[in-house]
């Protein structure tokens, strides 16, 4: 039979015939033979031939080598211009056509070519014999894959074992112990089983936020099926996860995707309920394959009839948003699915889940995970990582902390790396000194020789330490690896016990459980006790335990919250609060005390946990420390002044500007950018939010602030909920400043002044807004002695700047008093002080530095004489070096005497 008509062959079979010519030219053969066709078939991506040989237990690489023996026997030519059809290939094609006819197929397909190959005397039989096979064995493998299907279409091969190609058998993975244990979720799994047991519309869809464990529920069902912990209607069923990506990938022509999906569905329906399909991200089914105006049908429409009739049992999983966007808009598809809502587990449930997963992660990473680390992962992730969901974020913390520790174990310890670096430096210095010694005409001086001896001595000592530490590190590392290998074997034996128990082979299960497993556990205990002895001596180089601090470090890396703040107890942090704030905010004892008390109340659990840490309205004249107190709060509570989100409320005077806080509505310019307040807090949820000059904002702004102050949350223009529970909200206002300036000097009138200020507030702000603020704090005008302390703080700032230029600064009390007098103005607070310091200190010092009057190493002395600041520098007395008189030359004596 001449292979000239492609219409007689399937696509894969014809592709192999065409590519066999390239194979023949590659081996420089002039005749096109059976072996070239087989090599071309084996080179096809996801080809049927490779799957058939795999089913017949034939090694693909071994088969390729066997076929190459025949190609090497053929006559070769340096340049193959024309190929000739070999006699054995002609016979093979005739046999393939005969097989097609006897099997009542329309096209010659890959399996027909393989039947012809198996009956070939020159190559086929000899090749199969090398693998202890005969033509009947190959035919059985073909029929096992092909089943009862007929070759009626050119792409028929793609429809064989469609579920194997486009799916993943979860029950088989559960049988092999490849799935993680599923802890809890009993209620959801029972609901899924209940829906699957229905006569029609038996298709549950798992709906929940990303990371709450929807896929885990399907895996839990697979494990229950394997263990027989399901009703009769689900016993011995296969749960197969459909991979929509591989189903769509490579579908180039119209209708190709639909054909693949139909072949999958046909396999499922032909199984008579033995196969349950699991489609993760089921929303991708809706619209998949459909093209506007192309006439092709999307996957959702293909599924509807089978879902409704109960021919197909399918479990879907998708997020709430995707379900709303894609499935709810198609009511015909939605009614065929029964919703099973999967909620986020609590912190306690998450800890239980982590305890169940602990062993898997320990064996994978080769480390130990402490229980306190698991508790920390659940609690810290719940508290500090707000944009993700439990248990996924807690599992990720444990996984990353274990991976980090594993990396430390496999890398050199810090102590050894330090020694290596020091040795490298010394070796370079030694080479330099030795080169100087060998240079002609230049001998090394006495100091160089002494230095060389010291270097050599240090190198010898360090090499000894390096050898000792390196040996210790390698032995500890080896011991940890041995323990991990034993634990892997232990896990394999446990899996064998489970398999034996499922197969009711109690003898085998007992033999492993009370024989091999006990011996292995004893070996592990011995190795671990040896490791504990080394660690107990305090000389260990490697850590093998993931602790609470490791988890905290990972959280710090994710969220930007410094590590020491996470581990510091609330009691220590809050007891230091007032003292720390007073270092930055001079005076204002009442304000600092009120802020500290409110934060202590919130952190001690005496306030609704759904509200922000604290919300304050700071009132007072300009320059008295309102903004500085907000900065100090951010610096202390969050270790960074950058954790303060400052919004100037004078920018929100118009009604339409309010939308800038939470983002423009859909359809308006700037919708994608988000709001200034919502985006800032969403990106940095642990911050001090400063709303400056709040009385200047439009009244509608306060409507938005009401839900922030009361519920600790806000919904931006894109529907995202922004969490304000870990923020401190500080609002500043100048309302009532005239009352504070006129009355605050007299303590007796304080109550009267306070009433007048509050009365002014009530005139401007609505009662529902004022009622939601934790504390209204009045800032007093600054007194002269407080201004003096502020000057001292500012001088320290200048000293830091000068320190970079190696210049020191010293002020007399008179100079300090002069600066205070120059900048004292009760109406404007501390701000005139800053201008006075700039004018009277910074400007003259800057000029003298540029004139080289003050240079590195100088100490600037500043005093006040007759109302003017005098700048001078301290002159250090210079002393000549003492030398013996007999060594002084005549010239030097003359200079000294003069």
UniProtKB/Swiss-Prot annotation:
S-S bridge residues: none
Chain intervals for the UniProt region annotation (C-terminal): 782-898
Location(s), subcellular: Cytoplasm
Domain Clp R residue range list: 6-148
Coiled coil region boundaries: 395-536
One GO cellular component term: cytoplasm
Any Pfam family the entry gives: AAA_lid_9
Region (NBD2): 570-781
Record's keyword annotation contains Cytoplasm: yes
Gene3D superfamilies attached to this UniProt entry: 1.10.8.60, Clp, N-terminal domain (1.10.1780.10), P-loop containing nucleotide triphosphate hydrolases (3.40.50.300)
Spans annotated as Repeat 2: 85-148
Residues involved in ATP 1 binding: 208-215
Molecular functions per Gene Ontology: ATP binding; ATP hydrolysis activity
The UniProt record lists the keyword DNA repair: no
Residues engaged in binding ATP 2: 620-627
GO biological process: cellular response to heat; protein refolding
Renumbered residue ranges of the record's region NBD1: 161-344
Alphabetical keyword list: ATP-binding, Chaperone, Coiled coil, Cytoplasm, Nucleotide-binding, Repeat, Stress response
Assembly information from the UniProt record: Homohexamer. The oligomerization is ATP-dependent.
Function per UniProt: Part of a stress-induced multi-chaperone system, it is involved in the recovery of the cell from heat-induced damage, in cooperation with DnaK, DnaJ and GrpE. Acts before DnaK, in the processing of protein aggregates. Protein binding stimulates the ATPase activity; ATP hydrolysis unfolds the denatured protein aggregates, which probably helps expose new hydrophobic binding sites on the surface of ClpB-bound aggregates, contributing to the solubilization and refolding of denatured protein aggregates by DnaK.
Domain comment as written in the entry: The Clp repeat (R) domain probably functions as a substrate-discriminating domain, recruiting aggregated proteins to the ClpB hexamer and/or stabilizing bound proteins. The NBD2 domain is responsible for oligomerization, whereas the NBD1 domain stabilizes the hexamer probably in an ATP-dependent manner. The movement of the coiled-coil domain is essential for ClpB ability to rescue proteins from an aggregated state, probably by pulling apart large aggregated proteins, which are bound between the coiled-coils motifs of adjacent ClpB subunits in the functional hexamer.
NCBIfam families according to UniProt: chaperone_ClpB
UniProt family annotation: Belongs to the ClpA/ClpB family.
Protein name: Chaperone protein ClpB 1
Native species: Synechocystis sp. (strain ATCC 27184 / PCC 6803 / Kazusa)
Gene name of this polypeptide: clpB1
